[in-house]
Amino acid sequence: MEQYHGTTILSVRRQTADGIQVALGGDGQVTLGNIVVKGTARKVRKLYQGRVLAGFAGATADAFTLFERFEAKLEKHQGQLTRAAIELTKDWRTDRVLRRLEAMLAVADHSASLIITGNGDVLEPEQGIVAIGSGGAYAHSAAKALLSNTDLPAAEIVKKSLEIAGELCIYTNMHHTIETL
């Protein structure tokens, strides 16, 4: 799967006595080639009346187009995350304009966490961890270790994992946006 430079997006799900915790976060760095042009971008947001978390890796304008399309699919399918993701992916693969978009989405609600790609993939990774972007592998590894070996809440796991990714990936910074459900 192609990884885009310039960001790290991570989502973690954790079952607790109080229910399922879901957190999704990302760093704020935007690069143009090897130059940092912005350090405080917001690549994570809540969609569908605050019930869905979404983050992107890739071209910013493309990602905003995908956010709009994805939110429209969520509205059409009454917030059914998986169905909306599949419908978006169908459009992404068949529409001439959408087909050229270079971005990936990480989305989550209380029922699922998914990666949506322009290759036509809707992936639900195991263990409730979704990681995309250039620092995704670092953040995923850190989150997996923290999820297995600590009782930290999901949001804290996302925070600490993004910090570790920021220490290792030159395209990831320490300015984080973290949303929770």
UniProtKB/Swiss-Prot annotation:
Give the superkingdom in one word: Bacteria
Span of the signal peptide: none
Q: Which Gene3D superfamilies match?
A: Glutamine Phosphoribosylpyrophosphate, subunit 1, domain 1 (3.60.20.10)
First-listed, main subcellular location of the protein, grouped into a coarse class: cytoplasm
Supply one GO CC term from the record: proteasome core complex
Q: How is its activity regulated?
A: Allosterically activated by HslU binding.
Q: Which reaction does it catalyse?
A: ATP-dependent cleavage of peptide bonds with broad specificity
Cited CDD domains: protease_HslV (cd01913)
List the EC numbers from the record: 3.4.25.2
Q: Name one GO molecular function term.
A: threonine-type endopeptidase activity
Which top class of enzyme applies to this chain? hydrolase
The active-site annotation reads: 7
The cellular location(s) given in this protein's UniProt record come to: Cytoplasm
| InterPro entries, per database record | ATP-dep_Prtase_HsIV_su, Ntn_hydrolases_N, Proteasome_sua/b, Proteasome_suB-type
GO BP annotations of the record are: proteolysis involved in protein catabolic process
Q: Indicate which residues the UniProt annotation says bind Na(+).
A: 166, 169, 172
- Keywords carried by this UniProt record: Allosteric enzyme, Cytoplasm, Hydrolase, Metal-binding, Protease, Sodium, Threonine protease
Note the subunit structure: A double ring-shaped homohexamer of HslV is capped on each side by a ring-shaped HslU homohexamer. The assembly of the HslU/HslV complex is dependent on binding of ATP.
Task of the protein? Protease subunit of a proteasome-like degradation complex believed to be a general protein degrading machinery.
NCBIfam families (alphabetical): ATP_dep_HslV, PRK05456.1
Q: Which PANTHER family match?
A: ATP-DEPENDENT PROTEASE SUBUNIT HSLV, METALLOPROTEASE TLDD
Give the UniProt family note.
Belongs to the peptidase T1B family. HslV subfamily.
Protein name per the record: ATP-dependent protease subunit HslV
The top of its lineage is: Bacteria, Pseudomonadati, Pseudomonadota, Betaproteobacteria, Burkholderiales
Gene name for this UniProt entry = hslV
